[in-house]
Amino acid sequence: MPEFLELHSKTSKLLRAAADAAVQRHGLRLGQDHLLAVLWAEDGRTPGEIAAAVNVTTPAVTKLATRLADSGLLERRPDPHDNRLVRLWLTPAGRALQEPIEAERQALEDRITATLTQAERAHLIKALTKIQQVLVSDLA
């Protein structure tokens, strides 16, 4: 396997495990925090809008939303203008998770980039952004 792909694959697996452990401390599973983050930014979005924002399928969002609704973190409400649509809204418990989850994510980022200089960190973010743009373009 090419050097970059191998290193990226191993790093991604480790990062995913660390991120999963961080959100599990708050009763969430990896992915649920991403859905909640979309709603923290703009509450009342449709599953399709959330799917586009986090680059997953609408059925995947629906499944995550069901688990979050069952946990009391969000609720489904019909769209007031289109009866075919459902919108997802945070409950007070869902809103209350924003600060601790964002703090966990920031602490994780700080921990894993602690050995990088500011210049190295900026370069890494710039390089990863360029790679992401190529992949998004290729998959479009």
Predicted ranges, named:
Residues 1-26, 71:
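N-terminal leader segment of winged-helix/HTH proteins
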Residues 37-41, 129:
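Short, locally clustered residues in the helix-turn-helix/winged-helix DNA-binding domain
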Residues 16, 66-129:
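Charged, amphipathic alpha-helical coiled-coil/dimerization segments
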Residues 42-46:
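Short capping segments at the starts of secondary-structure elements
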Residues 38, 53, 71:
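Residues within the alpha-helical elements of helix-turn-helix
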Residues 47-48, 59, 66, 86:
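Residues within helix-turn-helix
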Residues 2-6, 26-37, 122:
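Short alpha-helical elements of helix-turn-helix
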